[in-house]
């Protein structure tokens, strides 16, 4: 259970760091609007995992590890598709 909790924490940290990093970019003023919406979805999925993850580590450790990478990939794909749409 400890091993599963470690990668989840690293993934959550990466999500937290990705949000301010995108917002810090001055050139992408229109992009943060789209990325912020997607980041909120990711945060909403990660926040319950953190709060409910502490009491139910065994139950959420396996599903959270499986659920986290799937949304990340989907979010990245959505960003790639959304950004060019805004640019055009």
UniProtKB/Swiss-Prot annotation:
UniProt GO molecular function: kisspeptin receptor binding
Cellular component terms (Gene Ontology): extracellular region
Keywords attached to this entry: Cleavage on pair of basic residues, Phosphoprotein, Secreted
Regions of compositional bias (Polar residues) in chain numbering: 1-13
Compositional bias segments (type: Basic and acidic residues): 78-88
Annotated localization: Secreted
Pfam families: Kisspeptin
Tissue expression as described in the entry: In the hypothalamus, expression increases with puberty in both male and female monkeys. Robust expression in the region of the arcuate nucleus (ARC).
Compositionally skewed regions (Low complexity) per UniProt: 33-55
GO BP terms: G protein-coupled receptor signaling pathway; positive regulation of cytosolic calcium ion concentration
Highest taxon above the source species: Eukaryota
Region (Disordered): 1-88
Entry function: Metastasis suppressor protein. May regulate events downstream of cell-matrix adhesion, perhaps involving cytoskeletal reorganization. Generates a C-terminally amidated peptide, metastin which functions as the endogenous ligand of the G-protein coupled receptor GPR54. The receptor is essential for normal gonadotropin-released hormone physiology and for puberty. The hypothalamic KiSS1/GPR54 system is a pivotal factor in central regulation of the gonadotropic axis at puberty and in adulthood.
Family (UniProt): Belongs to the KISS1 family.
Protein name from the UniProt record: Metastasis-suppressor KiSS-1
Source organism of this protein record: Macaca mulatta (Rhesus macaque)
Source organism phylogeny: Eukaryota, Metazoa, Chordata, Craniata, Vertebrata
